[in-house]
Amino acid sequence: MSNGLIHASGLKKSYKIGPNDVEVLHGIDMDIENGEFVSIMGQSGSGKTTLMNLIGMLDRPTGGSILIDGDDITTISRKEMVDYRRRTVGFVFQQFHLIPSLTAYENVALPLVFAGDKGHSAALDALERVELSHRLDHKPSELSGGEQQRVAIARALVMSPKILLADEPTGALDKETGERIISLLNSLKDDMTVVMITHNHDLARMSDRIINLQDGKIKE
């Protein structure tokens, strides 16, 4: 068995569509090491988002296993999975999903509030990591698209996750701003593993490694 932070073995996922079971992932074997920045690429329907949902514990596989830092997350209860996900994984999406009425600081601090942590010093630290501490009192409408995505990244960092999952994080940004966001993600890998879904080959080449999916399998 690999000592990788993320270890998938024989990973399968199928969905019930009418009377039929449609398999989306067909026995994925994959290792991602601690401190890696990995891009997952593939055509629409190749299984990229399904794979990320399984790694991020937003869904369960129908076969195989996933180990995160040696813990088999496919065998734990749903309640345990929610708690493990909250402590282990941060998410960044194409859309920023910031609350318009809250400041940058308040948006970043939200996960801490839900976790019952009222200290919030971690929110300031996260904003500093994305170089936005000078904009902490600004609301989303007062920030550029790139700044809003930085706030979203800071929010994903605030619980100190082991894994950062980014699903098309530059899709709503122009080329230059997108490259700056990827450079920022690359700078985070000293403290965590970064896994990104992207259709952009140029941005994917900025990561350490590319995993190509085709028809629910890893393309060698």
What are these regions (language model features)?
Residues 210-220:
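H-loop (His-switch) and adjacent beta-strand-loop-beta switch element
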Residues 1-3:
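Short, Lys/Arg-enriched, disordered terminal segments
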Residues 5-210:
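ABC family nucleotide-binding domain
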